[in-house]
């Protein structure tokens, strides 16, 4: 068993986020079942004044 930086390379193989059905971005978290960009599957779209991509 190896501890430290070398063992962190094992985390790079898995895909945490997949493409979202609503916004199309690669932001849908597979385990949390929620899009970090638009908030899918919430009914209201995720929108904050400090986010610049939709202004």
Curated annotation (Swiss-Prot):
It comes from the Archaea. One of its GO terms (cellular component) is cytosolic large ribosomal subunit. Keywords: Metal-binding, Ribonucleoprotein, Ribosomal protein, RNA-binding, rRNA-binding, Zinc, Zinc-finger. A zinc finger (C4-type) spans 20-38. GO terms for biological process: translation. InterPro entries: Ribosomal_eL37, Ribosomal_eL37/eL43, Ribosomal_zn-bd. Binds 1 zinc ion per subunit. SUPFAM superfamilies: Zn-binding ribosomal proteins. GO terms for molecular function: rRNA binding; structural constituent of ribosome; zinc ion binding. Zn(2+) binds at residues 20, 23, 35, 38. Coiled coil: none annotated. Its cofactor is Zn(2+). Binds to the 23S rRNA. HAMAP family: Ribosomal_eL37. Belongs to the eukaryotic ribosomal protein eL37 family. This is Large ribosomal subunit protein eL37. It comes from Cenarchaeum symbiosum (strain A).
